[in-house]
């Protein structure tokens, strides 16, 4: 039930959907076994993600959850694969920065388009097809919100291609937990999306890893 609430209501850049989906995958791999305390913790984690976002997460929106968001220029996705392919191939992001006293996660919000779409694809593979359409609609909203741009500056362009399939990637000294989180999603999508070019995908997203400390 908590996952359904997260699916139908965008919050914290899709974290509740991501947490819930990973939990379902673990339960599936464990043949339904899950200690009560872990189940309680997962539900709390999803509930926190649903209830505790800050309303001005996206630049240009004072209360994005209660404002109308025009998604007319975002494609209508029929499947999670379509959505995920769009997300990995359309990454135009700016460095995170403070504007008038508020810190905005510009590139952070865009990388979560990828992790959110990957979670929806995983949900489909787990058999939860009833959750896909509302999930895709909330992802469209997230994509639109993440396209907000700072008043100054230019999009960040990655300087090198960083590859999570290479050992050197895992030797990088990075504290940001999104480093491995994004690597998981990108690795999963490269393996599960047909008709994409691995080098193109990695070039599109490597800037995210460069911006992590």
Task: Give the ranges of each region predicted by the language model.
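Mature, well-folded catalytic/scaffold domains that follow N-terminal targeting or propeptide regions
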Residues: 1-213
